[in-house]
């Protein structure tokens, strides 16, 4: 492809709307343009990168035995009501009513649709297992779409769904997809980690997220340097030390604490450690107010708390008015003693007594509180977020914390949807059984953005060769010189014939403009041909990842180039 005939409108300045580096560079490199909030048009360069990702995803899905289909984007409400997710999914589900007053939604995911398909087609165990996938545009009505392709309302996703006759088969399907995902991200040239994760609104018995490692990632990954343990911070288990004998605790005592609203203020006022204070946090779940207790120096893990409550709607902090109605006190003075609502405590709190808690009265706290004696706690369970210094739940080594971007998620769904939608088959004994399901998602468009978040520099994008719209940029510095143009055309034809996607910059522009655009667009390989190089019989090279420059001879160019290119790809961990 010749850049003089290509639509690649690069920008010198970063649009004010762009916050994260991938959004900035995708706009500046002429890969996407915003239509409206969270919805983008893919320009030729962006679409080529998207298609390159989809190609590898499709190849590995096919290799794993999954079969490609294409399901409708519009889904009837009846299916979602049958599964129970119509009310549970929340406002991210874009709902509408057609001219016949039929309720529908734009699909953010397709568990209901694919289960409905299979339940009408599969009758016997002989038809199982089956694994169906699609690559399709999805829609989620994000409340605050931002970060370009990272968190848009419309996005391209690969979603696969497996159906098995028994648990062992479902496990085999799950781990088969897990391995396929690992191959995909390796082939894409990305640094990634698979971690245990919460199943969220999709549901299921267990799941893993595939995270692209990036300092700008929204997710925190907890990993053990000594074993294979890894988890999203939402899922990571917080380990308690062994319980010991507790000394007797004096009777609870109410004291005045005027103006001490936070645990830090209170601890300083009382001259006690923050860790001796209990935070009482009031939440509303499914219309009911509940309390969660964690140590003053800990943070509540809201995902763990929501899962404990099996909350159908989003968990939210109680408003100041709701706190006062439940406790009789303003925010900052709530406590578990005498509280007439369900109280749940982090299990760490059972290991000690003599706590400081709110007195459920303005400007007052209680000293010497023993939760077992003074409060009515429904249960003690793991409710806190893991923190630096916490041990690995598998081997006891101290955990490491890194940032990542979720680009893939695999779920073992079990019977969640097959039971709800009555997807059954007849087993070997002629007995009706529910199919056991798994689902597996990859954010195809998100991978493009994540690759940039992981791989960029001051000059622009640094794409891995398997994602880059063009693996090579051939820059002709002398577009008015017939000899230079003829040699550039010759090299371009040889590269193209060898299956190497190449962008020939034949524009009548200054060299500096061409070099800056090549860096900005992220071509992994840069080849430069100019009058001086022609005179010397060489082509200049640049490895975009390392910035290393070199030369290749025009005589026997392609053989020398093939060896050099292999080294560039090896640097990305590619064959």
Swiss-Prot record:
It comes from the Bacteria. CDD domains: ProRS-INS (cd04334), ProRS_anticodon_short (cd00861), ProRS_core_prok (cd00779). It is found in: Cytoplasm. One of its GO terms (biological process) is prolyl-tRNA aminoacylation. It holds the Pfam family HGTP_anticodon. One of its GO terms (cellular component) is cytosol. Transmembrane segments: none annotated. It is an enzyme of class 6 (ligase). GO terms for molecular function: aminoacyl-tRNA deacylase activity; ATP binding; proline-tRNA ligase activity. SUPFAM superfamilies: Class II aaRS ABD-related, Class II aaRS and biotin synthetases, YbaK/ProRS associated domain. HAMAP family: Pro_tRNA_synth_type1 (MF_01569). Consists of three domains: the N-terminal catalytic domain, the editing domain and the C-terminal anticodon-binding domain. PANTHER family: MITOCHONDRIAL RIBOSOME PROTEIN L39/PROLYL-TRNA LIGASE FAMILY MEMBER (PTHR42753), PROLINE--TRNA LIGASE (PTHR42753:SF2). Catalyzes the attachment of proline to tRNA(Pro) in a two-step reaction: proline is first activated by ATP to form Pro-AMP and then transferred to the acceptor end of tRNA(Pro). As ProRS can inadvertently accommodate and process non-cognate amino acids such as alanine and cysteine, to avoid such errors it has two additional distinct editing activities against alanine. One activity is designated as 'pretransfer' editing and involves the tRNA(Pro)-independent hydrolysis of activated Ala-AMP. Homodimer. This is Proline--tRNA ligase.
């Amino acid at each position: 492809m010749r850049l003089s005939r290509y639509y690649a409108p690069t920008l010198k300045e970063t649009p004010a709307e762009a916050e994260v580096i991938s959004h900035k560079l995708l706009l500046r490199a002429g890969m996407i343009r915003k239509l409206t909030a969270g919805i983008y048009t893919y320009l030729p360069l962006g679409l080529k990168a998207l298609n390159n990702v989809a190609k590898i995803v499709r190849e590995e899905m096919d290799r794993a035995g999954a079969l490609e289909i294409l399901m409708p984007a519009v889904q009837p409400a009846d299916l979602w009501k049958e599964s129970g997710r119509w009310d549970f999914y929340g406002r991210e589900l874009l709902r509408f009513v057609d001219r016949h007053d039929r309720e529908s939604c734009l699909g953010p995911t397709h568990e209901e649709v694919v289960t409905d398909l299979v339940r009408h087609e599969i009758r016997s165990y002989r038809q199982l297992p089956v694994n169906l996938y699609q690559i399709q545009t999805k829609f989620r009505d994000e409340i605050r779409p931002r970060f370009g392709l990272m968190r848009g309302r419309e996005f391209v996703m690969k979603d696969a769904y497996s159906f098995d006759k028994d648990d062992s088969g479902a496990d085999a399907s799950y781990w088969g997809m897990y391995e396929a995902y690992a191959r995909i991200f390796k082939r894409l040239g990305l640094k990634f980690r698979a971690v245990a994760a919460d199943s969220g609104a999709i549901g299921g018995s267990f799941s893993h997220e595939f995270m692209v490692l990036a300092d700008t990632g929204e997710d925190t990954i907890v990993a053990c340097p000594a074993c294979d343990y890894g988890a999203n911070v939402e899922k990571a288990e917080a380990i308690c030390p062994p319980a010991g004998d507790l000394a007797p605790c004096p009777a609870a005592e109410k004291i005045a604490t005027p103006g001490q609203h936070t645990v830090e203020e209170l601890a300083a006022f009382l001259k006690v450690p923050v860790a001796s204070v209990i935070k009482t946090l009031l939440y509303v779940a499914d219309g009911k107010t509940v309390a969660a207790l964690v140590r003053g120096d800990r943070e509540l893990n809201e995902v763990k708390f929501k899962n404990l409550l099996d909350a159908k709607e989003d968990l939210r902090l109680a408003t100041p008015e709701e706190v006062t109605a439940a406790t009789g006190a303003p925010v900052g003075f709530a406590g578990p003693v005498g509280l007439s609502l369900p109280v749940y405590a982090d299990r760490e709190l059972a290991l000690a007594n003599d706590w400081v808690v709110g007195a459920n009265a303005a400007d007052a706290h209680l000293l010497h509180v023993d939760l077992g004696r003074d409060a009515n706690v429904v249960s003690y369970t793991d409710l806190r977020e893991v923190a630096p210094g916490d041990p690995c739940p598998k081997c006891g080594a101290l955990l490491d914390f890194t940032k990542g971007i979720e680009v893939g998620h695999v779920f073992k769904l079990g019977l969640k949807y097959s039971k709800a939608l009555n997807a059954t088959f007849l087993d070997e004994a002629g007995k009706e059984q529910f199919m056991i399901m798994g689902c597996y998602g990859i954010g195809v468009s998100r991978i493009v953005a994540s690759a940039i978040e992981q791989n960029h520099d001051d000059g622009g994008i640094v794409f891995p060769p398997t994602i880059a719209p063009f693996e090579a940029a051939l820059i002709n510095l002398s577009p008015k010189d017939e000899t230079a143009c003829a040699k550039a055309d010759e090299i371009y034809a040889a590269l193209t014939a060898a299956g190497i996607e190449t962008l020939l910059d034949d524009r009548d522009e200054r060299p500096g403009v061409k070099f800056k655009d090549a860096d900005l667009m992220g071509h992994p390989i840069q080849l430069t041909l100019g009058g001086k190089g022609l005179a010397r019989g060489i082509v200049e090279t640049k490895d975009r990842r390392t910035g290393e420059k070199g030369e290749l001879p025009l005589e026997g160019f392609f053989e020398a180039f093939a060896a050099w290119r292999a080294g560039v790809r090896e640097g990305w961990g590619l064959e």
